[in-house]
Amino acid sequence: MAKRDYYEVLGVSRTASADELKKAYRTKAKELHPDRNADNPQAEAQFKEVNEAYDVLRDADKKAAYDRYGHAAFEGGMGGGARAGGYGQQGDFASAFSDVFEDLFGDFMGGRGGAPRSRAQRGSDLRYNLRVTLDEAYRGVQKTINVPASVACDACKGTGAEGGAEAVTCPTCSGMGKVRAQQGFFTVERTCPTCNGMGQIVKNPCKVCHGAGRVEKERSLSVNIPAGVETGTRIRLAGEGEAGMRGGPSGDLYIFIEVREHALFQRDGVHLFCRVPVSIAAAALGGEVEVPTIDGGSSRVKIPAGSQTGKQMRLRGKGMPALRGGGAGDMLIELAVETPVNLTARQKELLREFEKLSEDNNPEGKSFFSKVKGFWDGMTG
């Protein structure tokens, strides 16, 4: 099968600069790298094609020969020089591309060379979901929680070695935590299978933790929940996560708060909302109603005469405290005018009489039916 044009392979024009060629190569190489395309059998061939194209175009002499003769410049019979130091030498190839691979795959492959890895590793962070009541969120509370986690092994003091002895340098990777393997035309670095990337091994593993340096245990912790927390509030306990590996520092524990729903109050940030039922008489004539407050007390609220369902009144400072200070929110009271049920005959009689006398006392009703009449007149007119 005929080879594709090298410029087409890299997706650049024939006038591309050296920097543009390098940038295009890095993009293509990263996209087609075999380790990133395990499920694509064509990726390796395409990756080699990209490497071959860049190997030619990055070299001024080979690029000049390719621009003049095309692929024929590297197929023999074109005189000396064109193939010198060319694509076929794996050692030279890997060396020539080391700067690109180092920059492109440094994080992906763990980097080349460098100092031996430290055996100590920080422990993982942990998450704990804690539910509190709205009353507890209002006042603040001290909670005791039980956290299952990995903790430092007491028998080996977290070293993983019997009697607390020191670990030794891994003979496979010489303490690097990585080993090199030839893959195609370049060298790939992978995690050392002997020490699992630790760089050191334990000759005589601790019989309690089997060399891990930590054991599973449930711990009881006291957590201070400040007043004003809400669902989603995160509390960090430094150093209370999983123990580090072989003497490394512990991770952190993050407490995520969930505030339970309340029977009377709904919450919106620092504000509280309470729906209060009132009788028809109280709504029509006005009066007072006693409402509970989150602090355990109550407040008497005046109901204006002629109040309707949905009317809101505000009790300032009776909401939730702000988490980081700054006072408290408000409590909003919404009236719900309650229609009486299970009426006696006398009550029904009085209501019918009241209805006859109240034609001019229902402005919203009159306005609504006036609009309905206008609507139907417009339909029939």
From Swiss-Prot:
Q: Give start-end positions of each zinc finger (CR-type).
A: 140-218
Q: Does the keyword Metal-binding apply?
A: yes
- Give the note describing cofactor binding and stoichiometry: Binds 2 Zn(2+) ions per monomer.
Stretches forming CXXCXGXG motif repeats:
153-160, 170-177, 192-199, 206-213
Q: Which residues form the signal peptide?
A: none
- Positions annotated to bind Zn(2+) 1: C153, C156, C206, C209
Q: Could you state one GO biological process linked to this protein? A: chaperone cofactor-dependent protein refolding
Q: What is its main location?
A: cytoplasm
* Binding of Zn(2+) 2, residues: C170, C173, C192, C195
Pfam families xrefs: DnaJ (PF00226), DnaJ_C (PF01556), DnaJ_CXXCXGXG (PF00684)
Keyword Cytoplasm, does the record have it?
yes
Matching entries from InterPro entries are given as:
DnaJ (IPR012724), DnaJ_C (IPR002939), DnaJ_domain (IPR001623), DnaJ_domain_CS (IPR018253), HSP40/DnaJ_pept-bd (IPR008971), HSP_DnaJ_Cys-rich_dom (IPR001305), HSP_DnaJ_Cys-rich_dom_sf (IPR036410), J_dom_sf (IPR036869)
Molecular function per GO: ATP binding; heat shock protein binding; unfolded protein binding; zinc ion binding
Q: Tell me where in this chain the J domain is found.
A: 5-70
UniProt xrefs under SUPFAM superfamilies: Chaperone J-domain, DnaJ/Hsp40 cysteine-rich domain, HSP40/DnaJ peptide-binding domain
Q: Which PROSITE patterns match?
A: DNAJ_1, DNAJ_2, ZF_CR
Query: What GO cellular component is one of the record's annotations?
Result: cytoplasm
Compartments annotated for it: namely: Cytoplasm
Keywords noted in UniProt? Chaperone, Cytoplasm, DNA replication, Metal-binding, Repeat, Stress response, Zinc, Zinc-finger
Which cofactors does this protein require? Zn(2+)
Function in brief = Participates actively in the response to hyperosmotic and heat shock by preventing the aggregation of stress-denatured proteins and by disaggregating proteins, also in an autonomous, DnaK-independent fashion. Unfolded proteins bind initially to DnaJ; upon interaction with the DnaJ-bound protein, DnaK hydrolyzes its bound ATP, resulting in the formation of a stable complex. GrpE releases ADP from DnaK; ATP binding to DnaK triggers the release of the substrate protein, thus completing the reaction cycle.
Assembly notes: Homodimer.
Which family, according to the similarity comment?
A: Belongs to the DnaJ family.
Q: What is this protein called?
A: Chaperone protein DnaJ
Species assigned in the record: Cereibacter sphaeroides (strain KD131 / KCTC 12085) (Rhodobacter sphaeroides)
Which lineage do the record's taxonomy fields give for this organism? Bacteria, Pseudomonadati, Pseudomonadota, Alphaproteobacteria, Rhodobacterales
Q: Which gene encodes it?
A: dnaJ
